[in-house]
Amino acid sequence: MTQTIFVLNGPNLNMLGKREPGIYGGKTLKDIEADCKAAGRELGLDIDFRQSNHEGTLVDWFHEADEKAVGVAINAGAYTHTSVALHDAIRAISIPVVELHISNVHAREEFRHKSMIAPACKGVICGFGPHSYILALHALKNITA
């Protein structure tokens, strides 16, 4: 049976490819989804890839993932730095969560240096461009095997 990984994306990630390409690169979220699904096939994983600009929807998806998946990769966007709700949703589920970011958030503005969700996650990957998603999938495959 193929294991499922949820890949969740937060606010403004639907704007990838248009939004600050000097920071985030030229790939769209659809491009990243295709890359994740291809990597998933190579790893024997089923990838459930989603994006929402709404915090409550992301919380609901964490709850759903706990029933349907073996792990979650999350690029929470700006919610990384503000969301106690996402922190609590991650703590509430029994499967591992990996936080990821396209850019190196620690080399950017001071307000991006603190993650509200990192303490609830198994690990954090950032700064490798869109490849951060693939690294997160490899990490989840390794810790759920």
UniProtKB/Swiss-Prot annotation:
Site features described as Transition state stabilizer, chain residue numbers: 19
Q: Which GO terms describe its biological process?
A: amino acid biosynthetic process; aromatic amino acid family biosynthetic process; chorismate biosynthetic process; quinate catabolic process
The answer to whether keyword Lyase applies is yes
Q: Which reaction does it catalyse?
A: 3-dehydroquinate = 3-dehydroshikimate + H2O
CDD domains in the cross-refs: DHQase_II
The record ties this protein, via Pfam families, to: DHquinase_II
The entry's substrate-binding residues are 75, 81, 88, 102-103, 112
- What is the enzyme's main class? lyase
Listed EC numbers:
4.2.1.10
A GO MF term: 3-dehydroquinate dehydratase activity
State the InterPro entries in the record: DHquinase_II (IPR001874), DHquinase_II_CS (IPR018509), DHquinase_II_sf (IPR036441)
Tell me the route in metabolism or biology where this protein functions.
Metabolic intermediate biosynthesis; chorismate biosynthesis; chorismate from D-erythrose 4-phosphate and phosphoenolpyruvate: step 3/7
Where along the chain is the active site annotated?
Answer: 24, 101
Sorted UniProt keywords = Amino-acid biosynthesis, Aromatic amino acid biosynthesis, Lyase
Q: How is the subunit organization of this protein annotated in UniProt?
A: Homododecamer.
- Report the family membership: Belongs to the type-II 3-dehydroquinase family.
Which NCBIfam families does the record match to this protein? aroQ (TIGR01088), PRK05395.1-2 (NF003805), PRK05395.1-3 (NF003806), PRK05395.1-4 (NF003807)
Cited function: Catalyzes a trans-dehydration via an enolate intermediate.
The name of this protein is 3-dehydroquinate dehydratase
What is the protein's species of origin? Answer: Rhizobium johnstonii (strain DSM 114642 / LMG 32736 / 3841) (Rhizobium leguminosarum bv. viciae)
